[in-house]
Amino acid sequence: MTLNKVYYSGGEEIRDLTIVGGGPTGIFAAFQCGMNNITSRIIESMPQLGGQLAALYPEKHIYDVAGFHEVPAAGLVDSLWKQAERYHPEINLGEAVTRYRKLDDGSFETTTKSGKVFLSRALLLAAGLGAFTPRTLPQLGCVDHLEGRSIFYAVKNIRDFAGKKVVIVGGGDSALDWAVGLLDAAEHVTLVHRMHEFQGHGKTAREVDEARDKGVIDVYMDTEVTAIETAEGGMKNVTLLRKNGASVVLEADRLLILIGFRSNLGPLAEWDLELVDNALVVDSHMKTSVDGLYAAGDIAWYPGKLKIIQTGLSDAAMAVRHSLNYIRPGEKIRHTFSSVKMAKQKKNEQ
């Protein structure tokens, strides 16, 4: 994904809507702003758009987004951006929002950690689950010098594992997905799980079982990684401890730890907004407890909320649409079919 400098701004200009978070929900919200003739900006704490999909799972395939029978996470992010970029949303990357202030005229002032201040007529929080850090294996001690070289917490590039002896730790969806997904690239794959049963999707668990039965993957259940040995700055082997007390030493070039992430809303949790289960309570219009401040995606809570990408996209459309009532009060909102709007826009571009 390439972002042209024309999309960047110092924040001096007031926009109709500031979107905090540049994941799928935030990007789609920017597209919806364009469809509704709303000027927008995205503020994203990461150095790239895409949220967790780009930062953690760019090569993971997604199967539950309408219209895509299968799509790589990075491919979905690119598709969403291609929709949004025609409306030239202002993009601010590497900027972590720390506070907001509602001004006397009802507009919003949003401040980032670097001290930048952004003005907008309304505010949309689409920051997912907030800041996230991977769960580690504390029994290994300090392994900072190996992270990104021999020890990984996500698959960002399959080439990092090509031709390597890979030990994967975990029993959830990500661990199972990559136990299968790395079989063709890696020299050998070993899956280690501390529980007796997998917690991931049944279909993928069966694929792992079938691969084990064929002898193309080793699986250790009721087992933990307790130590690693290095040589010449890289990993040489890992030590496993089985529930029965037996110890196993395996040759390994790569240790892929996929046991989940800790999420933290950070400053957002201190904004005096109503929270349930570490998410912001919204009404049927995606409005929080503050007029003009909306939330969408995983950061938003309402009864029956399902935290999947598809729901986040719907939330974004709802939030943007209803923000019009706050941004331009009294204006009659008319629905325009996307095909009609695009036809007019293409005609004007000729």
UniProtKB/Swiss-Prot annotation:
GO function term, MF aspect, one:
flavin adenine dinucleotide binding
Give the residues annotated as coiled coil. none
Query: Which controlled-vocabulary keywords does the entry list?
Result: FAD, Flavoprotein, NADP, Oxidoreductase
Cofactor info, note text: Binds 1 FAD per subunit.
| Pfam families to which the protein is assigned, alphabetical | Pyr_redox_2
Reaction it catalyzes: 2 reduced [2Fe-2S]-[ferredoxin] + NADP(+) + H(+) = 2 oxidized [2Fe-2S]-[ferredoxin] + NADPH
Q: Where does FAD bind?
A: T25, E44, Q52, Y57, V97, F132, D298, S339
- Quaternary organization: Homodimer.
Give the enzyme's EC designation. Answer: 1.18.1.2
Q: Which family does it belong to?
A: Belongs to the ferredoxin--NADP reductase type 2 family.
- Its recorded name reads Ferredoxin--NADP reductase
Native species:
Chlorobium limicola (strain DSM 245 / NBRC 103803 / 6330)
Cofactor(s) in the UniProt record: FAD
